[in-house]
Amino acid sequence: MVLVMSGSIGCGPMTTLALKLLRRLPKDSFVVVICGKNKGDLKELQRYAKFLERLYPVGFTDRMDLYYSAADLVVGKPGGLSCTEIAQKGVPAVLMLSVPGCESRNLEFFTRYGMALGTESVRDTLSAVRRLLSSAAMRNRMMLAQRSIPQGAVAAITDLIEKGTVPLPAKEE
């Protein structure tokens, strides 16, 4: 399953990307598109899904952990929360269409350390997805790079995002 995430308010040509992915993926593959709060993208994708049985559009969900666990590959924006979740779950990723600033720095970091492939267009994204899905070695290297982040750091970042707090290290006696 290819999990496509458009960010909470959408990003770029998600419908075009999803439809082109469906045409290029093996017939036993399917695409789940998380539209977040973007009702326009959700409605448009739902219209297509009536005729395309391998397309599953989803609105806002608080169960991203389940989608990440089921995904063979994630395609999405390099937002801070998404990047953290991808690294925590160890899912191969293609990060695209970054917003200048924080997202572009996330993209640079994840691509520099081999934790994701970065793309700037639908065409590049389709090519990157094809390369990743056809190479188990490439996916494994990416997941290994994601796991190389110290887990204490990932846990602290996750706690900060979810709870607004960071656990303090235990005092040494």
Question: What is the meaning of each model-derived region?
Answer:
Residues M138-Q151:
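A short, well-ordered alpha-helix in the C-terminal region of glycosyltransferases
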Residues S69-G79:
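Acidic donor-binding loop of glycosyltransferase active sites
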